Amino acid sequence: MESLRELLGTEVGQTLIFTRTKRGTERVARELIREGFSAAMIHGDRSQSQRNHALNGFQEGRYQVLVATDIAARGLHVDDVAHVINYDLPTLAEDFIHRVGRTGRAGSQGCASTIFTPVEMMDLRAIERTLQLRMERRQFDPASSLPRRTVQNTLASRTLTALPGEVFV
C-alpha cells in the first residue's frame, strides 16, 4: 500500500486504477477507502445506478480515485484524469492503449503507470513490442507494495513502468 499511497499522494487531479477482475476492483477500492482515500469502483456486477453514481462522483471530484475493470476503459469520458494506474497488467496491447488513453486528454498533462510482477515480464514485453516502445521501469519493495497479491505470491519484486516521456513520482 506504500507504493500506491506514494503515487496517489502526489496527484493533484483524478486517478483511474484498472484491475483485471471484479474481485480485484473491490479489494483495491476497499483498501484505498480504509487508507483514507476517496474512492469509488465500477465493474460488471455493479448495477447501472451504482456505476452512474461512481462515475458522476468521480467526474464531479467527490472521488479522487476510480477503480475499474476494463468495462470503463472504452467510452469513459472524464476530462481531468491526471494518472492512470494499471494495477493489473492487461493481456492485450489494445486494452493497454484504451486504458492509458484515459489520461492526458485534450492536450492536458497526464501520466500512466503499470504495476507488474516478474512473472508478467513477458506479457509486458509483448505489449512493448506491439506498441513499438520501451517503458521506463522502477523497482518497488514487495513488502510495501499494493494489496493486489500477497507478498509470497509476488516472487521477488514489483516494477512500475511509465510511458516514454513520463516521470515517476
Regions found by a protein language model. Give the residues of each.
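Conserved helicase RecA-like core
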Residues: 1-169
